[in-house]
Amino acid sequence: MTKIIVVTSGKGGVGKTTTSASFSAGLALRGHKTAVIDFDVGLRNLDLIMGCERRVVYDLINVIHGEANLNQALIKDKHCDNLYVLAASQTRDKDALHQLGVGKVFKELENMGFEYIICDSPAGIETGALMAMHFADEALVVTNPEVSSVRDSDRILGMLGSKTRRAIEGAEPVKEHLLITRYNPGRVEDGHMLSLQDIQDILRIKIIGVIPESDIVLQASNQGSPVIHMEGTDVSEAYKDVVARFLGEEKPLRFIEAEKPSFFKRLFGGR
């Protein structure tokens, strides 16, 4: 059975698209046929991070409005055989999205044998975000360890509990997972960032992963490659852990403790 997962947040710039790219790639690397869809109509960034921007001919809106079929619009990922990208439109208005059309796209992807559909949602509560979350079975709620980001995520949790198809039909609720990005244990210790416990006390949903703050994320984006492919880096390992936990594996949280200075660093006055 196909599962639809929305990657969402209340605030922009927290790493939703980075997460959508690496999470979908991680599922595909584990052998699952996966589609990742950009719902940010008018802006479109997912194709850049996936490195397929020059291969976009048709997009989600073209498919919804019958201007192209799904096979024409899906772009096969260059890294993973099981991964396909459906880009957003840069030229249409968000009102071009409608529930019936989105539902038909999901049904067709299910008929094509996709196990997972990852919806890269725009931030906030506009049309694209509502469409991305409406059909969701599960949600990755992405937040930074900052008060404003966490507060906005709380608002999104309220919408997942009231605006989705599952909520409207009185079905089992959307399964919510909390993903914390740009986490810097040193800044947490200094009191400049919220701790994991602070965030959980506010949002009260289970943490599926913690992604450390790193310049590697920008480097991967500039190269047009999901950061999960940056082998040997903390960020790549953290996203692999997220995928493993999502698939039911037990993995302890990593990269959540500040590095202690070595004996020699302390001896010679390093901090």
Positions of PLM-derived features:
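Walker A/P-loop NTP-binding active-site region of P-loop NTPases
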Residues: 4-69, 116
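Flexible glycine-/small-residue-rich
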Residues: 9, 38, 87-90, 121, ...
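Residue-level signature of catalytic and energy-coupling elements of molecular machines
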Residues: 12, 63, 86, 120, ...
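Alpha-helical segments flanking ligand/cofactor-binding loops in enzyme cores
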Residues: 25, 107, 130-131
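P-loop/Walker-type NTP enzyme "switch/lid" segment
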Residues: 39-111, 221-222
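Amphipathic alpha-helical transducer elements in NTP-driven molecular machines
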Residues: 57, 71, 99, 103, ...
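Conserved catalytic-core segment of NTP-binding enzymes
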Residues: 111-112, 116, 122-208
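C-terminal lobe/tail of nucleotide-utilizing enzymes
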Residues: 167-271
